[in-house]
Structures are given as C-alpha cells and as structure tokens.
C-alpha cells in the first residue's frame, strides 16, 4: 500500500526537490498547508531553509507548530529536514535574535564554532548501529550539509521508563553538532537526504517504510 506524505508548505524549503525525492522513494506526496491534510497523512515532512526566526514565523502562520504537536501526541510520524529539524528544539539564537522553537526537544540552535562557514558539502556521520533510520546504509557514507547553525549540546534527560532517542553526531572542523535524531515517531536530519545521493534515498525509503 502506497504511503501518503504531506509536505508542509509554510514558505520555507525547496519543496520540489523534497517532493521528487519522496516520490522516487515510493510515497504519494501532497504539498499542503491545510491542517486536515497535514494531520491525516501517513507522514508529515517539514522542510526548512533560511533563518530560524523566519521559519518559525512562517510555520506559525499556517499553524504548523500545532500540526506537528497534534501528530506527535497521536503517535503519527513527523520528519524535519535542515531548519525543519532545528525548529523542533526549544530555541534558536541567530544574529542576536532569540526565537522560541516548537519545543519537542530541549536545546538551542546556535552558530557553529568553525573558521569556515557555512558548513557546505559532503560529510560523514558518527553512524549508529541497529538504527531503523540508517538501515541499509554503510557507516562510511557521506551526506550533504548546508548550514552555519546547529545544535551543539544534547540536553534531553532520560530515565528507565522511556527509550532514549538515537542522537547522531557529525563534526565540521573541530566542532561537533547533532546531525540527526531518531526519537520514536519523530525523525529529523540536519543534512539534506533529498540531496544526498543513494544514501539519502535509502534513508527516505526507511522513513516511508516506518510510517
């Protein structure tokens, strides 16, 4: 059975690139900002390009933060890409502007501590083992990044009653940052799987199979 993915249209992100990649991975894609469509699809993908503050304003204009929260409360899968991952955290701090995020994870998006920014191009990950997100992907695969900001500290506390998220790290120069998170029905990547060749295509297939 073909899975339906709502690609959230809130004025940010390369929708066509993401749509084509999802369709190649086997999904039926609906580009929409309609709350009913986005809430009822099998999966919701949240893209994002640009500044954290601008993306949050666009998201709130279409009630995207509520859509994300409602889906997760009901156990329905959501995936964020690039700034679409960043806005899932508590706060963004860019160019001196502090903005509240969706608050699904604690933590702050801040400027990377590196000489050369943006971090643009292909990079490896500290690849996890036994991860549904990275199933079928070689540990030495590279993924495509374009960003100057990221989450440099993971602060979510866990206990014996909950399954801890799978947090995947990468490094630009000597600065380590969160490259992906697999947290039950909430997946997210700082890199662009839709621009990451065969490895990115496999990751999207893994997500579609999961939903």
Curated annotation (Swiss-Prot):
Pfam families assigned to the protein according to its UniProt record, in alphabetical order: GATase
Enzyme Commission number(s): 4.3.2.10, 3.5.1.2
Nucleotide-binding as UniProt keyword: no
Reactions it catalyzes: 5-[(5-phospho-1-deoxy-D-ribulos-1-ylimino)methylamino]-1-(5-phospho-beta-D-ribosyl)imidazole-4-carboxamide + L-glutamine = D-erythro-1-(imidazol-4-yl)glycerol 3-phosphate + 5-amino-1-(5-phospho-beta-D-ribosyl)imidazole-4-carboxamide + L-glutamate + H(+); L-glutamine + H2O = L-glutamate + NH4(+)
Oligomeric form and interacting partners: Heterodimer of HisH and HisF.
Domain Glutamine amidotransferase type-1: 4-211
Molecular function in Gene Ontology: glutaminase activity; imidazoleglycerol-phosphate synthase activity; lyase activity
Protein name (record): Imidazole glycerol phosphate synthase subunit HisH
Primary localization class, coarse: cytoplasm
One annotated GO biological process: L-histidine biosynthetic process
Organism: Corynebacterium glutamicum (strain ATCC 13032 / DSM 20300 / JCM 1318 / BCRC 11384 / CCUG 27702 / LMG 3730 / NBRC 12168 / NCIMB 10025 / NRRL B-2784 / 534)
Functional summary from the UniProt entry: IGPS catalyzes the conversion of PRFAR and glutamine to IGP, AICAR and glutamate. The HisH subunit catalyzes the hydrolysis of glutamine to glutamate and ammonia as part of the synthesis of IGP and AICAR. The resulting ammonia molecule is channeled to the active site of HisF.
Pathway participation: Amino-acid biosynthesis; L-histidine biosynthesis; L-histidine from 5-phospho-alpha-D-ribose 1-diphosphate: step 5/9
Entry-linked InterPro entries: Class_I_gatase-like (IPR029062), GATASE (IPR017926), Imidazole-glycPsynth_HisH (IPR010139)
Gene: hisH
Keywords: Amino-acid biosynthesis, Cytoplasm, Glutamine amidotransferase, Histidine biosynthesis, Hydrolase, Lyase
GO cellular component: cytoplasm
């Amino acid at each position: 059975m073909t899975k339906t993915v709502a690609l959230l249209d809130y004025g940010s992100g390369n929708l066509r690139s993401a749509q084509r990649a999802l369709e190649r991975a086997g999904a039926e894609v609906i580009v929409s900002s309609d709350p009913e469509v986005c809430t009822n699809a099998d999966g919701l993908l949240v893209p994002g390009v640009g500044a954290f503050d601008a993306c949050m304003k666009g998201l709130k204009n279409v009630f995207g933060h509520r859509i994300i929260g409602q889906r997760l409360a009901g156990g329905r899968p959501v995936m964020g890409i690039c700034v679409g991952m960043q806005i899932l955290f508590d706060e963004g701090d860019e160019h001196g502007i502090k903005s509240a995020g969706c608050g699904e994870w604690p933590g702050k998006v801040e400027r990377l501590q590196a000489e050369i920014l943006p971090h643009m191009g292909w990079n490896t990950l500290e690849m996890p083992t036994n991860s549904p997100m990275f199933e079928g992907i070689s540990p030495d695969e590279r993924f495509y990044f374009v960003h100057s900001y990221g989450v440099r500290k993971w602060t979510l506390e866990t206990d014996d009653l909950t399954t801890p998220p799978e947090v995947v790290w990468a490094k630009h120069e000597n600065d380590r940052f969160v490259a992906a998170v697999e947290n039950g029905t909430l997946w997210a990547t700082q890199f662009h799987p839709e621009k990451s060749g065969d490895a990115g295509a496999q990751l999207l297939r893994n997500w579609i199979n999961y939903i």
